Amino acid sequence: MASMLQNGLLAQYYHKDIASNKQAVKEKNLLQELKIKKVIVHSFEGDRSESGGFFCEKKISKNYTLIETYTKSYISGRSILTSSYNENGLLLQSMDSSDMAVSASQYEYDAKGNILKITSRSHSFDDDFATSLTEVHQYRYDEKNRPVQMLRIRNGKDSALIDFLQDEIGNITDEIEPGINGKHFYYYYDDKNRLTDIVKYNAVKGALKPDFIFEYNRQNQLVKMVAIEEGMSGDYNTWQYVYGDEGQRIIEKCFSKENILLGYFEYEYK
């Protein structure tokens, strides 16, 4: 179960850069509101036994501008995730380092708190070779602070423009990368403007298929996420979330396509 801490399917720019950033800030603000200084994550396997060799602890600074998460497991080794926030609660930098790779992202904002630029650098290495990548995302907004375009630059030379379309309310509905190999993502919402589906064209199946499906409770908390793999198998995992009375996530379970429990996390707050 320890290897499933991070969902590797997340790839859509709007979801990854903007929506997930807002969610991270929201979760940090809740920790600050509840005066929580430490979070311990306990990992369990599908048979409900503890995940051997797993350790995960999140430490929060006194002024809530620095959060360090240390994770160790037999499967993925050791890693440290450091997140820095400014006095307004906006994420400034995140750095994730492990025995095999280091990645860091820096965030720049305009006066209204919109993300203007994200600069990400990653470096991975093993006994045979090392690889490095620098990727910059530059966002442009309309007069209502809604993203309309993003310029992606890889290693200072490979660039592409990503266009965003909106509905009449202002929800992002389409993310379009022009070109033969460009992808077109569709975002769907419920009657409360909550994101319910992220869909793209699946070339293998020749049809529009979802990458993610989301469900919420009456408190607008995410209670279920289905992550679908690409390809012919149509395999997917379902994540279910349980929250405490004060809004903090306390349990996170993962099920297979056959509804078999693969493992789960329990969160302890101090």
Where are these predicted regions, by residue range?
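C-terminal segment of classical bacterial N-terminal signal peptides
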Residues: 2-9
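Buried hydrophobic residues that stabilize the cores of well-folded domains
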Residues: 10-270
